Amino acid sequence: MSEFPLPNVSTDLSGQVAFVTGTTSGLGKRFAKVLAACGAKVVATGRRVDRLEALAEEIRADGGICEPIVIDMTSRDSIRAALVEAESRLGTVQILINNAGIPDAERAIKMSDELTDAVFDTNLIGPWVLSCEVARRLIEQKMPGRIVNIASVAAFNISGAIATTLYSTTKSAVVRMTESHAVEWARNHINVNCIAPGAFSSEMMDGMLSRVGDISQGFPRRRICDPAQMDSTLLFLVSPASECVTGTVIKIDDGQGPR
């Protein structure tokens, strides 16, 4: 899928443990590979065991360190258990990438309680719980850390033509969560920032395109972005270069949306 080298922009993350959610496809898979290529010890998490193991094997074949751990982002017990398992295998998590998310793909008045709960739990409650668990450990050990939340440009703009009402709502909340956690944990040297992607190639995007058709021709550059084009921003936010950057939201959308 990618025409870009791995990683697109490099930095040294040797010795740091990076916990990435939603790594079985799309952006999360790319994030895990990029962080490992830069020396981080990666905890790759998700629901699909076969894909997690395949990703870990791929990273190890390239000389990286990766431990696959199954996680259910709708279950607080699963989240906490996965973090404990990650610590037992690799040590304290210093980098957290809250990437896991699901779409609603349904009009608000037609959404079932089950879908509503799943979207809220996966997109907001799960990242909240995981962020707090990681931060608590870092604070107890007086260690600095980096948390990067993945929101969406849907947090800022929504089209009535596409059923994304609840998805947009949860991603808006992720933006505010980023800002709030950044303020609360600044004194502890835990930087919390957010990336708000536009249309990038992923399973979620493929699903949307199958429902609404090709949207790229309405974009100024008439393209869907490649996950590799997010490398430099991700690495900036987890590296010493962003030491003074916290509570910031960076839109990466190729000029696709309004301002």
Where are the regions that the model predicts?
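Short C-terminal tail/terminal secondary-structure segment
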Residues: 2-14, 235, 246-259
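Conserved glycine-rich cofactor-binding loop
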Residues: 24-25
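Active-site helix of classical SDR
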Residues: 131, 170, 178
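Residue(s) in the substrate-gating loop at a strand-loop-helix junction
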Residues: 152
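Short, small/polar-rich loop/turn modules that mediate ligand/substrate recognition or access, typified
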Residues: 186-191, 245-247
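Alpha-helical segment proximal to the catalytic Tyr-Lys
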Residues: 136, 183-184, 243
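Substrate-binding pocket helix/loop in short-chain dehydrogenase/reductase
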Residues: 107-108, 112-120, 215
